[in-house]
Swiss-Prot record:
Signal peptide: none annotated. PANTHER family: PHOSPHATIDYLGLYCEROL--PROLIPOPROTEIN DIACYLGLYCERYL TRANSFERASE, PROLIPOPROTEIN DIACYLGLYCERYL TRANSFERASE. Belongs to the Lgt family. PROSITE patterns: LGT. It comes from Pseudoalteromonas atlantica (strain T6c / ATCC BAA-1087). This is Phosphatidylglycerol--prolipoprotein diacylglyceryl transferase. The gene is lgt. It is found in: Cell inner membrane. A 1,2-diacyl-sn-glycero-3-phospho-(1'-sn-glycerol) binds at R141. The chain crosses the membrane at residues 23-43, 58-78, 93-113, 120-140, 173-193, 200-220, 241-261. GO terms for cellular component: plasma membrane. It holds the Pfam family LGT.
Length: 280
């Protein structure tokens, strides 16, 4: 029966090298995601009063926040013991390892700094960029699949995949589940929802709720990190680290949407050109 499943081919993670520099599939997916997000941001720009300079600054700092926050978050959330024994591991980015939840914290810090610089509200910036985030998430999951990493739990479904280094049994292609839900579906939901003016903070809240829910669901099919495993807890729920980190996002997203709707402060998402508009 095992032979009837798809056996993942051995794919070199490095596409090509020029001297000491190498282009990896995962890095290429980041570039593709950033380019697509930049293009879509230009489309959204036409419906707001942002300037192109402000857009470029925002995306630059947001991208930097993703990279730095993602790496720091991965080390602290998933490899903390290794970091304690080898602090330089934080800088060994060629070994791989990025955390979405860490990247989210990095983006939040970048957006907060940018909103102060642009003299607009933090949630206005968050509402503008939230529909763009799933593009990068989806591209990253494709990179995970090509690298045959972050595979799912063992299964007997007909679309199970035998990944190299994951044993002889077929597994859920959980990377593709996340690509579909956290990338495609979440993008469509946010893009369509944000086409009309919404209460400030509602789009950001919907992103937190949507991603947190999809990630929490997919974690049931994703193999837990070997050095962490599952947290059984008092009720033997067997939840993963990803689910623990996603639960606050779900709660925070619901709370933010309720707050935004109750406040009912309608506005186009974007950076107002005047301080008066920013305070409106």
């Amino acid at each position: 029966m095992v032979s009837s499943y798809f056996t993942f081919p051995q794919i070199d993670p490095i596409i090509f090298s020029i001297g000491p520099l190498s282009l990896r599939w995962y890095g290429l997916m980041y570039l593709v995601g950033f380019a697509a997000a930049f293009w879509l941001a230009g489309v959204r720009l036409s419906r707001t009063n942002w300037t192109k300079e402000q857009l470029s600054d925002l995306l630059f700092w947001g991208f930097l926040g993703v990279i730095l926050g993602g790496r720091i978050g991965y080390v602290l959330f998933y490899q903390f013991e290794l970091f304690l024994s080898d602090p330089l591991y934080l800088f060994k980015i060629w070994t791989g390892g990025m955390s979405f939840h860490g990247g989210l914290l990095g983006v939040i810090a970048a957006l907060w700094w940018f909103s102060r610089k642009a003299k607009c509200t933090f949630l206005q910036v968050g509402d503008f960029i939230a529909p763009l985030v799933p593009i990068g998430l989806g591209a990253g999951r494709i990179g995970n699949f090509i690298n045959a990493e972050l595979w799912g739990r063992t299964t007997d479904v007909s679309w199970g995949v035998i990944f190299p280094g994951a044993g002889p049994l077929p597994r859920h292609p959980s990377q593709l589940y996340e690509f579909a839900l956290e990338g495609v579906v979440l993008f469509l939901i946010l893009w369509l929802y944000s086409r009309k003016p919404r209460p400030i903070g509602a789009v950001s809240g919907l992103f937190l709720l949507g991603y947190g829910s999809f990630r929490f669901f997919v974690e049931f099919f994703r193999e837990p990190d070997q050095h962490i495993g599952l947290y059984e807890g008092a009720f033997s729920l067997g939840i993963s680290q990803g689910q623990i980190l996603s639960a606050p996002m779900i709660i925070g997203g619901i709370a933010l949407m309720v707050w935004a709707v109750r406040r009912n402060k309608m506005a186009e998402t974007g950076v107002p050109k005047s301080s008066k508009a920013a305070k409106a």
